[in-house]
């Protein structure tokens, strides 16, 4: 049996547990949120006995942000000192529907080159 470098990552399971735990907390907060944004402070330090703590931090933050973006959220992260804040925003369904209707109407506006034809049609009536 061949051994691969990725199989030697002892923190992989710990990272996945942290990712899942953080996503569950974020999901609970999102469901309770009345506005269309959430500011959430991520853990900044990971106390693993082996491995690379900065690498774990990178992998965990990446997975959390990727998961949220794949579910339709816009995510920004601010890291300053010992703090890491996620800014999570989303469009409400009503806003999305309004945007779709406005775009649909824009597609049907008469363009400058069409005005001459349609204006002549109106004048002839």
Swiss-Prot record:
Domain of life from the UniProt record: Viruses
Protein induction: Expressed in the late phase of the viral replicative cycle.
Keyword entries, A-Z: Late protein
Family: Belongs to the asfivirus B125R family.
Name of the protein described by the UniProt record: Uncharacterized protein B125R
Organism the protein comes from: African swine fever virus (isolate Pig/Kenya/KEN-50/1950)
């Amino acid at each position: 049996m061949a051994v691969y470098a990725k199989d030697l990552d002892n923190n992989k399971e710990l990272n996945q547990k942290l990712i899942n735990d953080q996503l569950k907390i974020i999901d609970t907060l999102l469901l309770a949120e009345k506005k269309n944004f959430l500011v959430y402070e991520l853990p900044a330090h990971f106390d693993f006995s082996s491995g690379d703590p900065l690498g774990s931090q990178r992998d965990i933050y990446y997975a959390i942000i990727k998961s949220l973006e794949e579910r339709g959220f816009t995510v920004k992260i601010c890291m300053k000192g010992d703090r890491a804040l996620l800014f999570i925003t989303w469009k409400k369904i009503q806003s999305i529907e309004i945007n779709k209707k406005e775009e649909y109407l824009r597609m049907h506006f008469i363009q400058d080159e069409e005005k001459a034809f349609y204006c002549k049609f109106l004048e002839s009536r």
